[in-house]
């Protein structure tokens, strides 16, 4: 089945990777040299993917979880017709389409941003979950409209990371059939021999999770690799194929050592390696025409045929199931139904509720009117109010179910919804306590880097949690999340702000959102609907102002906004001019015009106080050098929530005291 031309193609891919790294004088040649045979076999014999039709919905997804091996992926994208050779010559250079680690939406053919080890593996689980759910929802007899595989190339480092354990456990429990991991098992890590740090039995580990395990003893045996992938595709549940490889294969002096992991070979070793491959070291970035032809006649031909057949199936599906087809097409587009927001609840002045509870009510409506809405909680659904009532749970028997039981696997949960968002067809969300956002912070960061429409629900947002004490009371988390570029961090002050926050989350196509919600009840602010709508979308707005000459600004978010209003009303009775500003979303406020910012925070009013039950970090930008921040510079305490709030100075009396001191 395989011949000398296949070997030439593999060695060409190795050589392209080596040359890109040598020209950049930076990169990781070891993985591309060792893993090229498995990647080549997958792409030419199995992968249903045409880089020139990168948005085809039913394509297979290929994720290079070992993102440091990016030169391999770029070489594959070039020989398959997606990436210009000039881009390989600009590897790791400013403005190129070949950055050091693969970047989503930057290079056609890159499904997700990888590099932080383990996250690609976990995002792949999310992609397989998306495929399973959408298939369960839309497929009908004779119409497997969603039917594709998720393939992962993972390294030893990926499998050492804790997130791989969480994600593998989840995938095994849910028996995600179309998830296949190719494990580049080369017994070397960056620092040296793998047995110095990693000695577990991969077979026993993954079989304990409920995975299938296949061993390929020779990573250069194309038939053995091909047979393993074929076997994996026929099995129930996820499969890991451990492929024993030699890192830096072909390098006479560096193969099998950590010296080839993360540094260029050097000119002398490059020449020796090319001779081992039977290639001319005088030729750089050389691709024989036969190599291009192999990819045209295998991968691209297969992908084009599959896409044409699928398009015909979709046409027939649309005739047989017109309503379902329209829903499916809307899901593929990533758009929201028209007027979905009209179905969301509005709250009057008689309403008092925790923003987590208001969010829970909104979730019920979103699930009803936004069919692509899908997610779950890390074993805190009852507390986060994140489950869809009366809906089925997602599992292997009811993949169409809407409630995902992520279990106590916060990091894997965060990465999984990123994978779902990148997959497409869904508006995914995940929920946990705000203090546990630390467990999934790297996934938040990666969602922002990728510009995904992921929504993270974080409840129990402050010291008002009370009895659970400092381990469960967030302090530094708000500042940490606000520091992430391209992240909506929205802390709503009441039910109406929560409603608009959800609208912002779903409509922010290229920005993830963290919703920071209370456990305790909040009264409804006396502000008209349009003001709230515009104000939350702009990040900050005026919720109360006295008629007197403006003298003081009180800034707050979340539960402290009403406290600020109470203090302002007291100051009003004393004849003071006060404005209260709700600032639910700093990120959005920073994007507003200087004129809008000045209209909210007039520069000639310097007596300012910010009030927030969290670290004061960041607030001084808004209160200025003469202003004050009523925040928290220590950890919380265990006691009834109202008492903790009082002891930490979040009272009307303390606000008035601080105002008088200005």
From Swiss-Prot:
**SUPFAM superfamilies attached to this UniProt entry:** Thiamin diphosphate-binding fold (THDP-binding) (SSF52518), TK C-terminal domain-like (SSF52922)
Q: Note the site residues: Important for catalytic activity.
A: 28, 261
- Listed EC numbers: 2.2.1.1
Pathways per UniProt = Carbohydrate biosynthesis; Calvin cycle; Carbohydrate degradation; pentose phosphate pathway
Q: Which residues bind thiamine diphosphate?
A: 68, 115-117, 157, 186, 261, 436
Annotated Mg(2+) binding lies at 156, 186, 188
Q: Which GO terms describe its biological process?
A: DNA recombination; pentose-phosphate shunt; reductive pentose-phosphate cycle
Q: Which cofactor does it need?
A: Mg(2+); Ca(2+); Mn(2+); Co(2+)
Please tell me one Gene Ontology term that the record gives under cellular component. cytosol
A Pfam family assignment = Transketolase_C_1
Top-level enzyme category = transferase
UniProt-annotated binding residues for substrate? 28, 261, 356, 383, 460, 468, 519
GO MF annotations in UniProt: metal ion binding; transketolase activity
Q: Where is the active site?
A: 410
Per its record, the protein catalyses: D-sedoheptulose 7-phosphate + D-glyceraldehyde 3-phosphate = aldehydo-D-ribose 5-phosphate + D-xylulose 5-phosphate
User: Which terms are listed as keywords in the entry?
Assistant: Calcium, DNA recombination, Magnesium, Metal-binding, Thiamine pyrophosphate, Transferase
Q: How is the cofactor bound?
A: Binds 1 Mg(2+) ion per subunit. Can also utilize other divalent metal cations, such as Ca(2+), Mn(2+) and Co(2+).
The cross-references to Gene3D superfamilies, in alphabetical order and at most eight, read: 3.40.50.920, 3.40.50.970
Tell me which CDD domains the record gives.
TPP_PYR_DXS_TK_like, TPP_TK
Q: Which residues form a coiled coil?
A: none
Query: Which NCBIfam families has this protein been placed in?
Result: tktlase_bact
What's the family?
Answer: Belongs to the transketolase family.
Q: What is this protein called?
A: Transketolase
Q: Which organism is it from?
A: Staphylococcus epidermidis (strain ATCC 12228 / FDA PCI 1200)
User: What is this organism's lineage?
Assistant: Bacteria, Bacillati, Bacillota, Bacilli, Bacillales
Which gene name belongs to this protein? tkt
């Amino acid at each position: 089945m395989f011949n000398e031309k296949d070997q030439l193609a593999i060695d060409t891919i190795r050589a392209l990777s080596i040359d890109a790294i040598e020209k950049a004088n930076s990169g990781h040649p070891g993985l591309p040299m060792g893993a090229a045979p498995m990647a080549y076999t997958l792409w030419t014999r199995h992968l249903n993917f045409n880089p020139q039709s990168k948005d085809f919905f039913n394509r297979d997804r290929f994720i290079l979880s070992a993102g440091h091996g990016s030169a391999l992926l770029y070489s594959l994208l070039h020989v398959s017709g997606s990436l210009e050779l000039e881009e390989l010559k600009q590897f790791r250079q400013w403005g190129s389409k070949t950055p050091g680690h693969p970047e989503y939406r930057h290079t056609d053919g890159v499904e997700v941003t990888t590099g932080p080890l383990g996250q690609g593996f976990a995002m792949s689980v999310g992609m397989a979950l998306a495929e399973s759910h959408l298939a369960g929802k839309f497929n009908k007899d004779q119409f497997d409209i969603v039917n594709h595989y998720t393939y992962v190339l993972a390294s030893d480092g990926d499998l050492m990371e804790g997130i791989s354990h969480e994600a593998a456990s989840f995938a095994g429990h849910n028996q995600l059939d179309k998830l296949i991991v190719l494990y580049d098992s080369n017994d070397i890590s960056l620092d040296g021999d793998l047995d110095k740090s990693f000695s577990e039995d991969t077979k026993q580990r993954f079989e304990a999770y409920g995975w299938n395990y296949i061993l390929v003893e020779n990573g250069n045996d194309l038939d053995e690799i091909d047979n393993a992938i074929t076997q994996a595709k026929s099995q129930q549940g996820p499969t890991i194929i451990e492929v024993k490889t030699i890192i830096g294969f072909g390098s006479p002096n560096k193969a099998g050592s950590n010296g080839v992991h993360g540094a260029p070979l050097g000119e002398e070793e490059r020449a020796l390696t090319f001779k081992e491959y039977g290639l001319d070291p005088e030729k750089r970035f050389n691709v024989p025409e036969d190599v291009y032809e192999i990819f045209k006649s295998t991968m691209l031909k297969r992908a084009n045929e599959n896409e044409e057949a699928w398009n015909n199936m979709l046409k027939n599906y649309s005739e047989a199931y017109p309503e379902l087809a329209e829903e499916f097409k809307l899901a593929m587009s990533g758009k929201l139904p028209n007027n979905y927001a009209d179905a969301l609840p509005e709250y009057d002045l008689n309403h008092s509720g925790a923003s987590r509870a208001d969010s829970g009510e909104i979730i019920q409506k979103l699930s009803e009117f936004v069919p692509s809405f899908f997610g779950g909680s890390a074993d805190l659904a009852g507390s986060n109010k994140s489950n869809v009532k009366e809906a089925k749970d997602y599992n292997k028997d009811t993949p169409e179910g809407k409630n995902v039981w992520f279990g106590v696997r916060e990091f894997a949960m965060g990465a999984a919804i990123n994978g779902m968002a990148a997959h497409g067809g869904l508006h995914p969300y995940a929920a946990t306590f705000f203090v546990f956002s630390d467990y999934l912070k790297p996934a938040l960061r990666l969602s922002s880097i990728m510009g995904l429409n992921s929504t993270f629900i974080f409840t129990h947002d402050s010291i008002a949690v009370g009895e659970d004490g400092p381990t469960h009371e967030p302090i530094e988390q708000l500042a940490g999340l606000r520091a992430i570029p391209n992240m909506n961090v929205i802390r709503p002050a009441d039910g109406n702000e929560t409603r608009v926050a959800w609208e912002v989350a779903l409509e922010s196509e290229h920005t993830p959102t963290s919703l920071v919600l209370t456990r305790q009840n909040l009264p409804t602010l006396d502000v008209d609907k349009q003001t709230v709508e515009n104000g939350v979308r702009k990040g900050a707005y005026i919720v109360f102002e006295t008629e007197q000459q403006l003298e003081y600004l009180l800034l707050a978010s979340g539960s402290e906004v009403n406290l600020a209003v109470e203090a302002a009303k007291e100051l009003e009775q004393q004849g003071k001019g006060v404005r209260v500003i709700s600032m639910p979303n700093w990120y959005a406020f920073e994007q507003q015009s200087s004129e809008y910012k000045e209209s909210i925070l007039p520069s000639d009013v310097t007596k300012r106080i910010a009030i927030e039950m969290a670290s004061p970090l960041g607030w001084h930008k808004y209160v200025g050098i003469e202003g004050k921040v009523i925040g928290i510079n220590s950890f919380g305490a265990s006691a009834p929530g109202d008492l903790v709030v009082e002891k930490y100075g979040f009272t009307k009396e303390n606000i008035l005291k601080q105002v008088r001191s200005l």
